[in-house]
């Protein structure tokens, strides 16, 4: 039978673990509020520029931009956004499962995939898988700077413009609320025309000054940058929300484990006391008989 000393040591150990997970939960709550506010403030810009792109693609363009060109898919590129740290439940695992499933589906029809990786977790997984990694960026922090992302994104855009890559996807965790975050994979290039009822019903078109090429090049590049940056903000907010839930679950489980150990401790202590009483009674009986 386990001694009371061993059980006490276990209770102390679990109690210390509970203090750590509770502290991590509180830190995650604080960081999540800040990152959620930052993420939500960026959504209007990302949505509006997406709407402008939808309107542009519905118009009659004199200049046919390469980002609008549909071509035969011989090779794809994927931007994968993960966390740098763990302890956030199945956030990264669920995303990687979907990414690997998509990559494997393309591989079945002999379409290879090049990767741009953001986050240490994606780097460790896809490096182990032997994937072709074009660029990587890690340790972006809570408030990443756009300048830190442009170089990595520019590499895959250059591959697309040189027609070495025919489609680009972006994979990240989309923040829905504090309790749910969804792994998401969307096509970044070429631009897919959405069925925008407002845009299709309008007979107007844009006038470009000084020239459509200059305007569209700038607009499309801003769009790509905004989508990647917003996806990273979504993933950071999702990370802290998932970590908050994971640490709360760990704290609750620690509390339950402490109660179980306390019950075992009381039972062992009671058994020891009963045994000692029996020994005393037996000893007293032996003395009285003598």
From Swiss-Prot:
One of its GO terms (molecular function) is ATP binding. Keywords: ATP synthesis, Cell membrane, CF(1), Hydrogen ion transport, Ion transport, Membrane, Transport. It is found in: Cell membrane. Pfam families: ATP-synt (PF00231). GO terms for biological process: proton motive force-driven plasma membrane ATP synthesis. It comes from Buchnera aphidicola subsp. Acyrthosiphon pisum (strain Tuc7). Belongs to the ATPase gamma chain family. The keyword Membrane applies. F-type ATPases have 2 components, CF(1) - the catalytic core - and CF(0) - the membrane proton channel. CF(1) has five subunits: alpha(3), beta(3), gamma(1), delta(1), epsilon(1). CF(0) has three main subunits: a, b and c. GO terms for cellular component: plasma membrane; proton-transporting ATP synthase complex. This is ATP synthase gamma chain. It is a peripheral membrane protein. Produces ATP from ADP in the presence of a proton gradient across the membrane. The gamma chain is believed to be important in regulating ATPase activity and the flow of protons through the CF(0) complex. It comes from the Bacteria. SUPFAM superfamilies: ATP synthase (F1-ATPase), gamma subunit.
